[in-house]
Amino acid sequence: HCLSVFIANGFFMNADEQEFSGLVKRHKGTIYSVCLMFADNQDEANDLMQEVLVRLWKGFGTFQGKGDEKGWVWRVAMNTCITQDAKKKHFTKVPVEENLLTSDTEDSKQMRMLHDRIHRLEPFDRAIVLLWLEDLSYEEIGQIVGISAKNVSVRLVRIKEQLKKFNG
């Protein structure tokens, strides 16, 4: 028990591991939000989260403070989830019985419906919506996904129209 407390508090980590641990602590909520948007259930979101963390660790040595940390984390998370989503589409999808939101309140039903509609978007559009829901500016979204702020604005208008057309 004591050993796990020492490890959890970073006593046996080298400087890179401590720095990476701090990065994960600062951005774990954001990373998990991205994973949830691409997952069919919480177990899948946790698996995606692990994959994102592995990719962040592999790229951490080359990143380490060079550029915008938040943008880098977003890009790695988005790219990982989009790649995994594309791989998943090669397999037959089994209907999901476990829902991310299990409460039956009206708000949770609306949230579930919104999540389902967003989940039906193409991965790139889903990424744009997720970033927009996180209150990032069009400029920040554009930098992360690699398009202009004007293009972000146009795409969001089209995405909102598409979401309205989806049947619940």
Report residues per predicted region.
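Short amphipathic alpha helix immediately N-terminal
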Residues: 120-140, 144
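Arg/Lys-rich amphipathic alpha helix in sigma70-family domain 2
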Residues: 64, 75-96, 107
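A short, charge-rich alpha-helical start-of-domain segment used by transcription regulators
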Residues: 11-33, 37, 46
